[in-house]
Amino acid sequence: MNNMLDIWQSRLQEHIKETRTYMKYMLNDHLVIVLIFFLAGAASWYSKWIRDIPAHFPSFWVMAVLFSLVLTSSYVRTLLKEADLVFLLPLEAKMEPYLKQAFVYSYVSQLFPLIALSIVAMPLYFAVTPGASLVSYAAVFVQLLLLKAWNQVMEWRTTFQNDRSMKRMDVIIRFAANTLVLYFVFQSVYMYALLVYVIMAVLYLYMSSAAKRKTFKWESHIESELRRKQRFYRIANLFTDVPHLRKQAKRRAYLDFLLRLVPFEQRKTFAYMFTRAFLRSSDYLGILVRLTIVFALIIMYVSASPLIAAVLTVFAIFITGIQLLPLFGHFDHLALQELYPVQKETKLKSYFSLLKTALSIQALLMSVASAYAAGLTGFLYALIGSAVLIFVVLPAYMTTRLKKHGKL
């Protein structure tokens, strides 16, 4: 037993040390300053919106859905490694202390998003709930903590199943149950909430019984752990080089016509390589598309001010540009690129050419969203602000960043 606990403590210390190392680079970045200003602006807008909530706004449903998303995303960090399939497999019968510690750590470490959302939702709760008090909200928060534990246990039980459809069904059922029970809890309709709680208890008993007849899925847990680490590495790689990051590429043959737009010339060597990496890597094109869609929707359905629409547009483009910074070093592992008869200045020029093209397309789409929300004035503000950022600010800023990290 002590050996398994020692292994867990060693893994946990290693995990925390690695996380702190990368967080040091992430939190020291200028991006934090931008985020602070953005959060300050969002807080100001939120406080004004709370004072004048539209009568038709479904406040209880919105709170229930947002909390359900956080609760349903529960999981257990086992910190298992690929080698454990060989060295710890013979000790499977003695893994219980290790897994209990993993469960406790996962529960505590995942409380931060729940606490943060609870703080953000508190003004909305008091604004729309008749007779609301700190005691009533504290009662809601206690139930959120219990629901978090229930979701984590249920997710853990599904890891013993081989059927992927059952795992998908588990997520759907848990999300629906969380949403319903919280909708009733926020309105203090505990008669219906109790009924949902009973159903959730039955589901817990069923999944616990089903899990007892299954074995521990080593491959599945190790794969899940590696996937979560790679997800963190991808985020950290936006700020510093991460040697453990595994690159993934997708064919995307339907985008080949864009590659044909790059002239077949020696001076366009890196232009072709950067374009190919941008289109086929799982990191770059996806980031551009996701951020464009998310911020465009925020602008269209939240902002009616031309200035706010322009600020959101510039912020989205800045965030996207920063996250595309690792593209410049995408081929650093290829030693042969040093032999290419192409000057380094040409490589930098090719990178900025692609970056400006991609961000200009994003800026145009975001400006259209600004026009939808704030008219022609919003369109012009967003377009002008984006142009200054893309063609003046970002090139200078990113050149400095590349020199700082020894890329130039």
From Swiss-Prot:
One example of a Gene Ontology biological process annotation: establishment of competence for transformation
Segments crossing the lipid bilayer: 30-50, 53-73, 111-131, 134-154, 180-200, 284-304, 308-328, 351-371, 374-394
Subcellular location: Cell membrane
Top-level lineage group: Bacteria
Keywords (A to Z) from UniProt: Cell membrane, Competence, Membrane, Sporulation, Transmembrane, Transmembrane helix, Transport
Any GO CC annotation of this UniProt entry: plasma membrane
InterPro entries (alphabetical): EcsB_ABC
Disrupted gene: phenotype observed: Cells form colonies in which certain architectural features are absent or less prominent than those observed in wild-type colonies. The Ecs activity could be important for the development of communities.
Membrane topology reported for the UniProt record: Multi-pass membrane protein
Task of the protein: Presumed to form part of an ABC-transporter, it may form a transport channel.
Record-given protein name: Protein EcsB
Record organism: Bacillus subtilis (strain 168)
Gene: ecsB
